[in-house]
């Protein structure tokens, strides 16, 4: 059903074979046995045979974020790559990698899974990585994918240097995507840019049983700020004007700065009765200087026929008390 809809809507599909990292709580993903290898080749053959006639399918995935542990996996990856080419010479092969080594030179296309600046360093370090890739490996047909967790129910009052396993505010995810877009958008080095997940999804390995890297919540009801960033950048059919951090309607500091995503030109920002100047930070991203506000204030952004607004309560705000998160134990976990 999904591929049929992609055929109708003109969405491009990358179909993956199930060779990923390692099994849950396992150390290796590849076992050098004839049975293991033949099973993987058969699965790839069946995937190609079942989806060959879908015009939306444009590439065959060979592996994803494979760990280089145990036996050398590169001969097996070459067999998988040759199998895909033998069955379908019209489509390229692709892989997603976050490792160094020979496995990155096997498929026709390679997509780099990147997260510099999420747990270590600065998000600006992705520009350093990009420049090194341009200098040393520009012969590779490279794409890039990235993402970070953010929960709309988690609010941050101060900048955090690193995410915590049980406290991942949406604001940090938003800033991560903003900086990556600024550094990588429309870079000719990359043939494509991929976001890790469109939707949050259930994961037994994550706090709360949810992987929060999506742009939309697990129940599909709430769109995160990062969603509107990419809608402004990538959706030419639907105009976007969005004030960032609207869910943080209670703020304890009197000096506030605002960000707006706009695909319809520079917005005009009204804070109460005042007009606040905005400057373009990056493509479709606009930021204001900090302004002094107090009490209940309406903030409104206007650009052409588009308008977005939010009402804030500023000053003397009690910070929400964090609820203790119980330690995870063995056994099935609730995801919603």
Q: What function would you assign to each model-found segment?
A:
Residues 1-140, 150-152, 159-161:
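Active-site mouth of glycoside hydrolases
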Residues 41, 56-60, 81-85, 94, ...:
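Substrate-binding clefts and catalytic carboxylate motifs of secreted carbohydrate-active enzymes
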